[in-house]
Amino acid sequence: MTVIIQGRSFPDDLTQYAEFIGQGLLSPEEMRRIDQNAQALGISGLELMESAGTGLAMAARQYQPGKILILCGSGNNGGDGMVAARHLAGEADITVFWYDSGRQTDSTRTQLQRLLSCSVTSIPFRSRDDLIEHTRIFQDTDLIIDALLGTGGTGSVREPVRTCIEFANNAKAPILSADLPSPGIIPDRICAFHRAKTEGAHIYGIGIPLLAEISTGPGDLLILRNRNPDSHKGVGGNILVIGGGPYQGAPYLAGLAALRAGADIVRVVSPHYLPEPDIIHVPTAGDRITTADLATIIPLCKQADVVLCGPGLGPESHDVITSLAPYIRKGVFDADALRDPLPVAGESLYTPHAGEFARMSGLSPGKTPRERAHAIMKAQILGTVLLKGAVDVICDGSRVRFNQTGTPAMTTGGTGDVLAGVCAALMAVVPAFEAACIGAYVTGRAGELITQTCGYGMTARDLLTAVPQVLFRSTSERE
């Protein structure tokens, strides 16, 4: 029996995979990733908000307050506070100050409509003067709940939220912060949802599935940033692909994939020229890349943001890659670059299938995703490994992530070259581990889309057309 998640099978005993949950404090960015992935698994944002607000109400009851003042921002943290107010209505005298910014999230707007049907005092504020008018309420309460910013708080706090925090700190009542204290506020207690984001927090579960944390998903793309309107050529990445010889098309597929994933400039060092006008071809002397070509390639490695080595290279040219590695700041190593001795760049990403992993590490990768994760950690490779399979395993030696997107139709030749190219483009803008997670997720989803129309007739070139549909549609939806 298996559990089917996002098109690929996963072992049904997921309790074995709890060991891959990250340890320590959770960053706000990581929590947003998990939240988004939970929604992709069918847990709606409203459901998560209801669970968070219920936990916040439970924490508030421990104070046994007669009067509660709840301060709600316009983001999802404010929605958590509104849910808590609804649950506490009738148990205490509830006053809700909510920031009427005109930019509430959809979920918070829904919770506000629900709140207005409850027996609570609801007071919108738009300015510092609105708060000054109600200063007395801050002093005449038994508990203040801070649901102003939470994990959404970044940078300096602006008015009128700054005054709201000032008045809360000057009040006599204890402050209970929802999830993460708003910047500048001094809480008596922190009610953290799912996992702690700061020391001393009390954790309340909100029903987030395990796979939302340990698997890739649309939330992984949140780290990507849209380009500024004044961006210039090169800001998306200058990628160098080194490959070709026995297999002429592989480096070009990888280069085109990098372009489709947002790279601005792609050069391909290869013995053979294929007419691809979007790619800059750098020829080598013979039918294979040899050490005689180092003088040509080394300056290009120094110039590139990311160097992708290996597609279509052939084993005879492996010594060239090991000689180039010291000159590579960020490197993606695939195919015939995955041999002993393993090349190590300043920052390295390795993209082996099971056989290549065994060849480069001397270890059996195992069969299950769990066994493969342990094999990568045991190998102690200096970099991030994306071990391809029915379920891809991404590991940087400490963090582990699983990717379940994809389809059996992706066994067609060249899909690994596309994945490597996508990862190279992403690595120009994010670290290797994140590039591997996003690259695996996006390439797999692209394969799922193409399979709907092409079935098992899909080619790697077909995959190129779907990569930007997945990657940049998801990017625009974050706006």
Curated annotation (Swiss-Prot):
It comes from the Archaea. One of its GO terms (molecular function) is metal ion binding. (6S)-NADPHX 1 binds at residue 179. Residues 1-214 are annotated as: NAD(P)H-hydrate epimerase. The keyword Cytoplasm does not apply. PROSITE patterns: YJEF_C_3, YJEF_N. (6S)-NADPHX 2 binds at residues 312, 417. Its cofactor is K(+). ADP binds at residues 388-392, 407-416. GO terms for biological process: metabolite repair; nicotinamide nucleotide metabolic process. Residues 216-479 are annotated as: ADP-dependent (S)-NAD(P)H-hydrate dehydratase. Keywords: ATP-binding, Isomerase, Lyase, Metal-binding, Multifunctional enzyme, NAD, NADP, Nucleotide-binding, Potassium. Its EC number is 4.2.1.136, 5.1.99.6. Residues 31-214 form the YjeF N-terminal domain. It catalyses: (6S)-NADHX + ADP = AMP + phosphate + NADH + H(+); (6S)-NADPHX + ADP = AMP + phosphate + NADPH + H(+); (6R)-NADHX = (6S)-NADHX; (6R)-NADPHX = (6S)-NADPHX. Residues 353-359 are annotated as: NADPHX 2. Bifunctional enzyme that catalyzes the epimerization of the S- and R-forms of NAD(P)HX and the dehydration of the S-form of NAD(P)HX at the expense of ADP, which is converted to AMP. This allows the repair of both epimers of NAD(P)HX, a damaged form of NAD(P)H that is a result of enzymatic or heat-dependent hydration. This is Bifunctional NAD(P)H-hydrate repair enzyme Nnr.
